Amino acid sequence: MSRIQQVNKSILIRSFCTGAPSKSNFSPVGNFLRIGDVVPDFSQDSSVGQINLYKTLGDSWGLFVSHPKDFTPICTTELGRLAKLKPEFEKRNCKILALSVDSVKDHLEWMKDIEETQKVKINYPIIADQDRKVADLYGMIHPNADNTFTVRSVFFISPDKRLRAQITLPASTGRNFNEIIRILDSFQLTDKYKVATPADWVDGDDCIIVPTVFDEDAKKLFPKGFPKIKSYLRVTPQPNK
C-alpha cells in the first residue's frame, strides 16, 4: 500500500466518508448528537396520535425535521413542500416526521392553513413536543435562543437508527428539500458501493472510487472503467445506472 493510500484510508475511517455507521451508542455531547450515534428513541403525542420513533420508522430510513413555530410563514412553505415531495421519499424507503414545541390543537389548526395556502394535505405526523422532551434529547433548542422555539433542523436517520447527517439553519432560511433528497441518494448509493459522491453530484452523475480500493480490485468492481486523474482521484459512472 502506497503512502497516499495509507493516508487516505486513515482519513476515510476517521471522517465517516464511506457512510458506514460507527459502533458507538447514543452519547450526545452537550445535548448534541454526533454522526454515527444511535439516535434516542421516544414516544410523544402528534397530529396522528401517540407515536414511537423506532416503531414508526421500522426498518425504513427516517427524515426527522424540526420547525421553529406553528403559524409562521417559512415553516408553512416548508411543510407544504415536504408533503408534496413525500412520494419521492417513499421511493427511497424514507419516512417523514416533523416536530415543534406547539400543541396538537395548534398543529391541527395550522395544518388547515398549510393545506389552504400550499394546496396539499399534510401526509406525515407532526409531533407535539410541548414538554420539550424530544427537543432537549436532540439538541433542537439553542441555549441562547427563546426556549419556545426549536431550530430549523433536519436529522437523517438510517434503518439501524443511527444519525447519518444533520442540517441546522436559522429561522430566517428555509430548507432546500432537493438538497435533502440528494444527500439521501448519496447515502443509499455509497452504503452499497465503494464510491463517494463529489461536489454538486446528483443521482446519475459520475462518482469517485474510494481511495481504499486498489486498481486491481476496481477493475472488477467497476467494469465500466475509471479514468485515473490522480492516484487518489478515479472517476467512474454511477454503478447502479
UniProtKB/Swiss-Prot annotation:
<feature type="active site" description="Cysteine sulfenic acid (-SOH) intermediate">
    <location>
        <position position="75"/>
    </location>
</feature>
<comment type="subunit">
    <text>Homodimer.</text>
</comment>
<dbReference type="InterPro" id="IPR045020">
    <property type="entry name" value="PRX_1cys"/>
</dbReference>
<comment type="function">
    <text>Thiol-specific peroxidase that catalyzes the reduction of hydrogen peroxide and organic hydroperoxides to water and alcohols, respectively. Plays a role in cell protection against oxidative stress by detoxifying peroxides.</text>
</comment>
<dbReference type="Pfam" id="PF00578">
    <property type="entry name" value="AhpC-TSA"/>
</dbReference>
<dbReference type="InterPro" id="IPR036249">
    <property type="entry name" value="Thioredoxin-like_sf"/>
</dbReference>
<dbReference type="GO" id="GO:0005829">
    <property type="term" value="C:cytosol"/>
</dbReference>
<protein>
    <recommendedName>
        <fullName>1-Cys peroxiredoxin</fullName>
        <ecNumber>1.11.1.24</ecNumber>
    </recommendedName>
</protein>
<keyword id="KW-0575">Peroxidase</keyword>
<dbReference type="InterPro" id="IPR024706">
    <property type="entry name" value="Peroxiredoxin_AhpC-typ"/>
</dbReference>
<dbReference type="Pfam" id="PF10417">
    <property type="entry name" value="1-cysPrx_C"/>
</dbReference>
<dbReference type="InterPro" id="IPR000866">
    <property type="entry name" value="AhpC/TSA"/>
</dbReference>
<dbReference type="GO" id="GO:0045454">
    <property type="term" value="P:cell redox homeostasis"/>
</dbReference>
<keyword id="KW-0676">Redox-active center</keyword>
<dbReference type="InterPro" id="IPR019479">
    <property type="entry name" value="Peroxiredoxin_C"/>
</dbReference>
<dbReference type="GO" id="GO:0140824">
    <property type="term" value="F:thioredoxin-dependent peroxiredoxin activity"/>
</dbReference>
<dbReference type="InterPro" id="IPR013766">
    <property type="entry name" value="Thioredoxin_domain"/>
</dbReference>
<keyword id="KW-0560">Oxidoreductase</keyword>
<keyword id="KW-0049">Antioxidant</keyword>
<dbReference type="GO" id="GO:0004601">
    <property type="term" value="F:peroxidase activity"/>
</dbReference>
<feature type="domain" description="Thioredoxin">
    <location>
        <begin position="33"/>
        <end position="189"/>
    </location>
</feature>
<comment type="similarity">
    <text>Belongs to the peroxiredoxin family. Prx6 subfamily.</text>
</comment>
